[in-house]
Amino acid sequence: MTLNGWIQIALYGAIVLALVKPLGSYMTRVFTGERTFLSPVLGPIERGLYRVSGIDDRQEQHWLAYTGAVILFHVLGFAVLYAILRLQAVLPLNPADQTAVAPDLAFNTSTSFITNTNWQSYGGETTLSYLSQMLGLTHQNFLSAATGIAVAVALIRGFARASSGTIGSFWVDVTRATLYVLLPICVPYTLFLVWQGIPQTLGAYADATTLEGAKQTIALGPVASQVAIKMLGTNGGGFFNANAAHPFENPTALSNLVQMVSIFAIGAALTNVFGRMVGDERQGWAILGAMGILFLAGVLVTYWAEAHGSSVLNSFGLTGGNMEGKETRFGIAASALFAVITTAASCGAVNAMHDSFTALGGLIPLLNMQLGEIIIGGVGAGLYGMLIFVIVAIFVAGLMVGRTPEYLGKKIEAKEVKMAMLGILCLPLMMLGFTALATVVPAGLAGPANAGPHGFTEILYAYTSAAANNGSAFGGLTANTLFYNSTLAIGMLVGRFFVKIPVLAIAGSLAAKKTVPASAGTFPTHGGLFVGLLVGVILIIGGLTFFPSLALGPVVEHLAGAAGQTFATGG
């Protein structure tokens, strides 16, 4: 642990905090229909899109209609992406002559990108054409991110409105999220990445001769445009198999910093949007404060674990920390910070190999996902995931004082609590259920490259990542099989829709309620006491649910390593 490392972490936190208010103010104006500085340019385009699509932007939807639109949007997106992948060999922009993607892999990949997971059981440069990368994956990166933002805004309206039968229009929300938020940032962001050295070309792969005379093919493509939205939209899927560790995706320390900032930018700013739309910015800062506490704790543990290395490494005199699987241009601090950021959000991009982290260093990214990625989280998904925990925390506070729980003037009743618990419990069902299955069937046991607790963690990490819609992986798992492609895809679908649908049900229920004036007995939800309660509820639920699985994996691995015990490679 070095002063330079701490400065990097502090600088990152300061930049993200500095963006919260201006970006939050801008997005509030976008989603409340107010005029912005981009309205003169984008307004005519927006209205033109509505006319072509037959959408009345003044017609709002009941929560059931909003939910139906969300599901339909995903179904259509899946069908288009699946068709592109299966027909890849006969479609244009395929200079490397990539063949059609296999049915099970196409199913997994299509599910992955429409759900904002971006799990990849393949290497992009050896599997996909430029058309598949652009029209298929990059396109869905925009739409899946916009969908998450739209659902979060719908839930905010549920808290902000009173006696209302509608929560907005999905078609308007997803259009504005794409047109006014994602695209205006991604265009200059892409140009910045090109300046940093990331390729953006439709030219064929380049053939090169090394200094030793060997022939080498250098993969190229429209990389910068995909990297920009994969980071900003917390999608995470890499153009190349090495993801953000590849020098063509993340070549410099500056590009690394900007990419890390962009992962958190929208998610952090949405807490400010929440505060502004409910009429009390302190509410947003309280939620961001809870997120910040959990994030900082994760960074401290991961940085400490990686900087101190493992007892096995230290026994060989390697006392410089754990550099295995890390890029020297980033070092331990930036790699540990990136790992916590990408799993606190639902991004999943990596600039180091998580499978090569120490046992405790790998535990934190795993735990971040198991908590539901509510520490900033994915664009939109992080906020509505955290608000689910807020509802549970308010319910617990109400039980302790014997009062009907209230939040922002809305009574939290049985329906909201049931929907919140459904959204929370569907994740461990997928994460732990499929992990248990994979450890007892031959097709599952054939996947991990390592024996013992680390092999178990590789399986647990995969299903946790899929259900949490993260997409990062312990790379030692061979996942491109019928068993893993199918079960991981099911986990992604349940993790996406069995959270979104309860969230929209909560939004509709709250929007229809009247606002109750605050009284002397109302529990304040903008101070330190509430932040502490919220953090406690998150850790208790996460700890009770996932501690047994963590004990079987990274905890046992750490204790065994401290005792000098290692496990042979091989599942």
From Swiss-Prot:
UniProt KW DNA-binding keyword: no
Function: Part of the high-affinity ATP-driven potassium transport (or Kdp) system, which catalyzes the hydrolysis of ATP coupled with the electrogenic transport of potassium into the cytoplasm. This subunit binds the periplasmic potassium ions and delivers the ions to the membrane domain of KdpB through an intramembrane tunnel.
GO cellular component: plasma membrane
Family statement: Belongs to the KdpA family.
Membrane-protein topology: Multi-pass membrane protein
Record organism: Methylobacterium radiotolerans (strain ATCC 27329 / DSM 1819 / JCM 2831 / NBRC 15690 / NCIMB 10815 / 0-1)
Main location: membrane
Keywords attached to this entry: Cell inner membrane, Cell membrane, Ion transport, Membrane, Potassium, Potassium transport, Transmembrane, Transmembrane helix, Transport
Membrane-spanning parts: 5-25, 64-84, 136-156, 179-199, 254-274, 285-305, 330-350, 357-376, 421-441, 488-508, 527-547
Domain of life, source organism: Bacteria
Protein name: Potassium-transporting ATPase potassium-binding subunit
The protein's assembly and partners: The system is composed of three essential subunits: KdpA, KdpB and KdpC.
PANTHER family linked: POTASSIUM-TRANSPORTING ATPASE A CHAIN, POTASSIUM-TRANSPORTING ATPASE POTASSIUM-BINDING SUBUNIT
Cell inner membrane is among the record's keywords: yes
